[in-house]
Swiss-Prot record:
The gene is secA. It is a peripheral membrane protein. InterPro entries: Helicase_ATP-bd (IPR014001), P-loop_NTPase (IPR027417), SecA (IPR000185), SecA_CS (IPR020937), SecA_DEAD (IPR011115), SecA_motor_DEAD (IPR014018), SecA_preprotein_X-link_dom (IPR011130), SecA_SF2_C (IPR044722). Monomer and homodimer. Part of the essential Sec protein translocation apparatus which comprises SecA, SecYEG and auxiliary proteins SecDF-YajC and YidC. Belongs to the SecA family. Part of the Sec protein translocase complex. Interacts with the SecYEG preprotein conducting channel. Has a central role in coupling the hydrolysis of ATP to the transfer of proteins into and across the cell membrane, serving as an ATP-driven molecular motor driving the stepwise translocation of polypeptide chains across the membrane. ATP binds at Q87, G105, E106, G107, K108, T109, D512. GO terms for molecular function: ATP binding; protein-exporting ATPase activity. Induction: Repressed under conditions of excess protein secretion capacity and derepressed when protein secretion becomes limiting. This is regulated by SecM. Transmembrane segments: none annotated. This is Protein translocase subunit SecA. The keyword Protein transport applies.
Length: 864
């Protein structure tokens, strides 16, 4: 009942929003008549006119009707495609920083040109975000001619580009790229030593295609730039051998540590927890195999990391499956994207998990990595001044979009009514019965020449269906998604008569399945005037009619995904633009969703029906029960993403402080006064260790002098200061000022050996490198803290509050350590190293060999 009320409220709210925008759509349509009279040259001039009006005070909102009319008219002239009214609505919604839910085939790519053109008029840059490099290049190349016709520039930002090419791409009015590339560029920009090496401008407007995949599905995996660290990988092998000695609890989801067993597996959270019994056994095993001595405890600070390694090994064995989560190729573990089924050859799991899986599979164990920079996608996209997105499936995640990103979701009506027939789910007792029914459905589709798209949840299951079809000599395509361009071609042919296409549920998004197949043409005019093209067109029309007669594209879901939205995405491949189509999901009690998340009552009732071999059950009640199971998983995944964001918000505040400091250092020509300020702060801190109240005793003089000499090359005698001015005994502040002035004078004298240009570059390089060294150490220390902080829960402490508190103290300690080491290193360079290496520093700067210069600085830095 509550769900129906929420839906009713949401729909009525949606209708109100669309109704309020209707007048704006009418206004845009009226303006269309005036633009028909303009020549191409006159239409192009509109862009400069809009820019001038913005400059003199007009707002983007006031320009919207005219700007949308102009790009619609340009699209008609360039592509022969006129934006539908529903696409105009979508464009307005995107400009107003909302999520536009537009069904598959409704022309999201063309819709995006509307807000992209309008916001590009500001000159601040529009970033259109896609799921992969292929889609970024395809959409950029397709729309480039349209935007360039109107005087705007288009850039492409994909992996493998040079820094200069990336910089030029970001300088364009409209840039197409992938979410990861935008995020990694931001992190890389905050690791450079020179502002000229930055590629991004200030982040203004991001328009995200398939926004649910990028902001929801991929939000659980943070962006991480890592570098190798030297370490021994033997430990992973040795710990891996202990796993067989550990026994899982019988109730795999029960976290009450009363069950017999060494560890329990939480499949919902994808976590492994050790029981008290397990911890005792592990301690005995570590002693037995001589990891630790008999006298030592597992809980000693130097041994606690063994628990982390054992948990990694258990995760590798029980939660990460071959040909589902990863494949083995060329003696390497290659990650399979859980959402798309794509091979992620350039990525590795962090925190030692990848090494644990390598040990499990007995392949070469590569070195551990340390985190150099990290950020969640949530926090990256929240840096943009304006953010919006579009997808075919957003309404189920409307709450998350609003609570995390402050984005409202608006459902855009379809241009033509949806007539797809979504058939009820069929539930079988066993997987084999279900598979027989799926194969039978495919055979029937082939018999009536109906194209069928079979959606699976993993590569392994795709290959299993493929093997069964091969035995029956049924021609089919398997979408392995290794190459995005090949993926698009296979999807494009999936609408042809008799076509059988097997794909992971999310693969091929971004390419429409056209009934009869896609008819390729260079351009409309040339295509329809050639004799051969007319012949091809007639062939396509015949195929199109045949497919429509057979029932349109049929979708088969081989099991329910843990998210309703992913199921809707699969269904949404059929029934585009009012086309006929159908969909059916096949389930079994052995499916992951049913086994782990469906209620025991549902499974019990189905079993009591006494279904025979190859018999199935279908009922609206059953569909509701499955939906409830999916909602459970969705809520669980939302909690995981929310928790990830809450933890990252803590580090995000610290990251902002560090990145702001870096930017100030990079952009400032002279940081000498800043260094003198830090020097004064460190001297004051040092002196106050030896001062009690407002006076100091003579015994402290010698200890203080020694400390000042060691840290600041202070060669004066405090006694002589006191002999010269006896009031200093009682006026400690005056004495401190005298010591500070003396040391600062000495520092200035030594830096003046070279010109300001050289000394400033040295100061800047030291400051930046030490900042980076300690920030990297801090990131890894905080990550280690995060991995173990949940244990505080057993001591009746709030892990999240404890994490905030401890990470704050760690951050404060890091800032103090940075200041200490900056001063120590600069004094070492200017007071000691300059005596022998001064000319080397100067030569590197003069020759603009900055890599060698920074390396020389690094060698002179002595971290304590």
């Amino acid at each position: 009942m509550l769900g129906k009320l929420i839906n009713k409220f949401f729909l009525s709210r949606n209708e109100r929003i669309l109704k309020n925008l209707n007048d704006l759509v009418i206004k845009i349509n009226i303006l269309e008549k005036d633009l028909l009279k303009l020549s191409d040259k006159e239409l192009k001039k509109k862009t400069n006119e809009f820019k001038l009006r913005l400059k003199y005070g007009d707002s983007l909102d006031s320009l919207l009707p005219e700007a949308f009319s102009v790009i619609r008219e340009a699209s008609k002239r360039i592509f022969g495609m006129r934006h539908f009214d529903v696409q105009i609505l979508g464009g307005i919604i995107l400009h107003k920083q909302c999520i536009a839910e537009m069904r598959t085939g409704e022309g999201k790519t063309l819709t995006a040109t509307l807000p992209a053109y309008l916001n590009a008029l500001t000159g601040k840059g529009v970033h259109i975000v896609t799921m992969n490099d292929y889609l970024a290049q395809r959409d950029a190349n397709k729309n480039r001619i349209l935007f360039e016709f109107l005087g705007l520039t288009v850039g492409i930002n994909v992996s493998g580009m040079s820094r200069l090419d990336k910089k030029n791409a970001y300088l364009a009015d409209i840039t197409y790229g992938t979410n990861h590339e935008y995020g990694f560029d931001y992190l890389r920009d905050n690791m450079v030593f020179n502002s000229e090496k930055k590629v991004q401008r200030k982040l203004y407007f991001a328009l995200i295609d398939e926004v649910d995949s990028i902001l929801i599905d991929e939000a659980r995996t943070p962006l991480v730039i890592s570098g190798p660290i030297e370490n021994s990988n033997i430990l992973y092998d040795r710990i891996n051998s202990l796993v067989s000695d550990l026994i899982p609890q019988n109730k795999k989801y029960d976290n009450s540590f009363n069950e017999i067993g060494d560890f329990c597996i939480d499949y919902k959270q994808r976590q492994v927890n050790l029981t008290e019994m397990g911890l005792k056994k592990i301690e005995k095993l570590l002693v037995k195999y001589k990891f630790i001595s008999k006298e030592e405890s597992l809980y000693l600070s130097k041994n606690i990391f063994f628990i982390h390694h054992i948990l990694l090994a258990l995760k590798a064995h029980y939660l990460f499956l071959k040909n589902v989560d990863y494949i083995i190729k060329d003696d390497q573990i290659i990650i399979v994207d859980e959402h798309t089924g794509r091979i992620m050859s350039s990525r590795r799991w962090s925190d030692g998990l990848h090494q644990a899986i390598e040990a499990k599979e007995n392949v070469f164990i590569q070195n551990d990595n340390q985190t150099l920079a990290t950020m969640t996608l949530q926090n990256y996209f929240r840096l943009y001044k304006k953010l919006s997105g579009m997808t075919g499936t957003a309404s189920t995640e409307a709450f998350e979009f609003n609570s995390i990103y402050n984005l409202d979701t608006v459902i855009i009506p379809t241009n033509k009514p949806m007539i797809r027939n979504d058939l009820p789910d069929l539930v079988f007792v066993s997987k084999s019965d279900k598979m027989n029914a799926i194969i039978s459905d495919i055979k029937n589709c082939v018999f009536r020449q109906q194209p069928v798209l079979v959606g699976t949840v993993s590569i392994e299951k795709s290959e299993k269906i493929s093997r069964l079809l091969n035995k029956l000599n049924i021609k089919h395509n398997v979408l392995n998604a290794k190459f995005h361009s090949q993926e698009a071609d296979i999807i494009a042919k999936a609408g042809e008569p008799n076509a059988v296409t097997i794909a992971t549920n999310m693969a091929g998004r971004g390419t429409d399945i056209v009934l009869g197949g896609i008819l390729k043409k260079e351009n409309n005019e040339k295509f329809f005037t050639t004799k051969n093209s007319v012949k091809l067109l007639n062939i396509w029309k015949k195929k199109n009619r045949l497919v429509i007669k057979s029932g349109g594209l049929h979708i088969i879901g081989t099991e329910r995904h843990e998210s309703r939205r992913i199921d809707n995405q699969l269904r949404g491949r059929s029934g585009r633009q009012g086309d006929p189509g159908s969909s059916r999901f096949y389930l079994s009690l052995e499916d992951t969703l049913m086994k782990f998340f469906a209620s025991e009552n549902v499974i019990k009732i189905i079993k009591t029906l006494g279904l025979k071999s190859n018999q199935s059950i279908e009922h609206p009640w059953l569909n509701s029960a499955i939906e409830r199971a999916q909602k459970k998983v969705e809520n669980c995944n939302f909690d995981i993403r929310k928790q990830l964001l809450e933890y990252d918000n803590v580090i995000n505040e610290q990251r902002s402080v560090i990145y702001n400091e870096r930017n100030k250092l990079i952009n400032k020509l002279d940081i000498h006064d800043h260094i003198l300020f830090i020097l004064k702060d460190r001297i004051n801190f040092c002196i106050k260790q030896y001062i009690s109240g407002n006076s100091m005793n003579v015994d402290s003089f010698f200890a203080l002098e020694k400390e000042l000499k060691n840290n600041f090359y202070f060669i004066k005698s405090i006694n002589k200061f006191l002999e010269h001015d006896t009031t200093l005994y009682e006026n400690v502040d005056k004495l401190i000022d005298l010591i500070v002035t003396t040391i600062q004078f000495s520092y200035n004298k030594n830096t003046a050996i070279v010109s300001k240009k050289y000394s400033n570059m040295i100061e800047k390089s030291v400051m930046l490198q030490i900042l980076d060294i300690f920030w990297i150490e801090h990131l890894n220390a905080v990550d280690f803290l995060k991995q173990s902080i949940h244990l505080r829960g057993y001591a009746q402490q709030d892990p999240q509050q404890e994490y905030k508190r401890e990470s704050f103290f760690m951050f404060q300690s890091m800032l103090e350590a940075i200041k200490n080491n900056v001063i120590k290193s600069l004094i070492n360079i200017f007071f000691v190293d300059f005596k022998k290496n001064k000319n080397i520093y100067i030569n590197f700067i003069d020759q603009k060999d900055y890599d060698s210069f920074h390396f020389l600085i690094m060698k002179s830095i002595n971290i304590t």
